């Protein structure tokens, strides 16, 4: 019901007042992904700063670690990454993005992933030359992210003869 009605303030209140992040990871993912798709990273990360429990869900844990890095809490983020690795965590794409953001790698990581909105955001954040052309199969979340981050082609610059590009923008 909460997701269907998309009342983000009510969802946030419900999750944080009851501290049920681990009992309802789907609702938490919906909330932070929606904020990120609107380019409201600060709001998404504020959710994690208010969570008192250890985050069990892998995706939410990755998001939390990224927020720590974004808030310059590198040591805390590194500790959580090390703990996750000891428990068998392995995600080469995610790790390479974080290594760049933490300054361990100096060469920008240019791979782009549309697997999740977090992966897509990390793709954008770690690539100074980021270019992405959405297609009909691009998720609505990514379209929203592209729009709110001003990453869509300027409509005036689109060739009027490029029917595919025009229809995908529509």
Describe the residue ranges of each PLM region.
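Residue-level signature for tetratricopeptide repeat
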Residues: 1, 30-35, 67-68
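Alpha-helical segment of the N-proximal tetratricopeptide repeat
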Residues: 1-7
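Structural motif corresponding to the intra-repeat A-B loop/turn of tetratricopeptide repeats
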Residues: 5, 38-39, 71-72
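Solenoid-repeat scaffolds in large eukaryotic assemblies
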Residues: 8-11, 43-45, 74-80
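Solenoid-like repeat scaffolds
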Residues: 15-23, 47-57, 82-90, 120-123, ...
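Boundary/linker segments of alpha-helical solenoid repeat arrays
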Residues: 22-27, 54-63, 87-111, 125, ...
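Hydrophobic transmembrane helix bundles of membrane-integrated enzymes that assemble
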Residues: 48, 60-68
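Long, internal scaffold/assembly segments composed of regular secondary structure
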Residues: 96-170
